[in-house]
Design a protein with these regions (language model features):
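Coil residues (strongly favoring Ser/Thr
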Residues: 2, 60-61, 103, 160
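Intrinsically disordered, low-complexity Pro/Gly/Ser/Thr-rich segments with frequent PxxP/GP/PP motifs
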Residues: 2-39
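Short, aromatic- and glycine-rich surface loops/edge beta-strands on solvent-exposed regions
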Residues: 32-64, 168-172
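Residue-level detector of functionally pivotal "anchor" positions at catalytic/ligand-binding pockets or at interdomain
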Residues: 67-99, 209-232
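Aromatic- and Gly/Pro-enriched, solvent-exposed loop/edge beta-strand patches characteristic
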Residues: 117-192
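A short beta-strand element within beta-rich, extracytoplasmic domains
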Residues: 102-115, 172
């Protein structure tokens, strides 16, 4: 780990909004490198502090933690609503884009708890290379599962590794007409990447927000084969 000092910059008087274009803030040097080993996670803490004459120091600092992990997410981890489809055999799909080839190992979903667990239904977890035309890479039946704790996602392990590149989609096929009530985040709007199909073709969603499904990449999967013993 290392620390990068961006220095200081004087903001012109009477400036109420806008972006600071000071190069050390705008384009900081990368001086902390990833390990030569296979790291799955890395995080950086970015801190900005504003000082002024007579400033009390209260509320003068903005801190952001930038995480690099093994999953993609449009949501912020907190559901404000639930998403589902009201027609049997309907499908929903979220589009993602990879910058480099990687291996999909698992998919996480958050399901809202409901009265009498009404959404505890079976569904098909799906992965597509394309939805128009449909090119299905994975389809397997699972049951809605709740994970103990506040807003904890359930992780579905894929029984086969899927090597992906460029654009791909993850989603579900709903076997019944009961709403699965997948967590839906209103705070972050990624509606342009969410599509649904109730049997008459794919359409973009009309709802502003993000479906709480996440693809997980790159972890080593157990093979079930014992390690070979060295020859003597």
């Amino acid at each position: 780990d290392s620390i990068y000092d961006g220095g200081t910059f004087s903001v012109t008087p009477f400036r109420e909004d806008g972006y600071v274009d000071y190069i050390r803030f705008r384009d900081p040097r990368v001086i902390s490198f990833f390990s030569i080993y296979n790291e799955m996670f890395k995080s950086y803490t970015v801190t900005h502090t504003i000082n002024d004459i007579g400033f009390t120091g209260v509320g003068d600092t903005a801190i952001r933690v930038q995480k690099f992990e093994n999953y993609f997410a449009y949501d912020d981890g907190t559901p404000e609503a639930g998403y589902g489809l009201s027609v049997a055999n309907s499908k929903a799909a979220i589009q993602f884009q990879l910058n480099t080839k990687d291996t999909l190992r698992r998919i996480q979903m958050y399901f809202n708890p409901t009265l009498t667990s009404a959404n505890e239904q079976y569904f098909y977890l799906m992965v597509w290379k394309s939805i128009e035309p449909e090119e299905v890479l994975y389809k397997k039946r699972f049951k809605v599962t709740f994970t103990e704790g506040l807003y904890n996602f359930h992780t579905f392990d894929l029984d086969t590794s899927i090597v992906l590149a460029n654009e791909f989609y993850i989603g579900f096929l709903q076997t019944g007409s009961e709403n699965l009530n997948v967590g839906f985040d209103y705070a972050l709007d990624s509606r342009e990447y969410l599509f649904y199909n109730i049997g008459v073709g794919w359409n973009p969603t009309i709802f502003s927000g993000s479906l709480m499904m996440r693809p997980l990449f790159g972890e080593v999967m157990p093979t079930g084969v014992e390690d070979l013993k060295p020859l003597k």
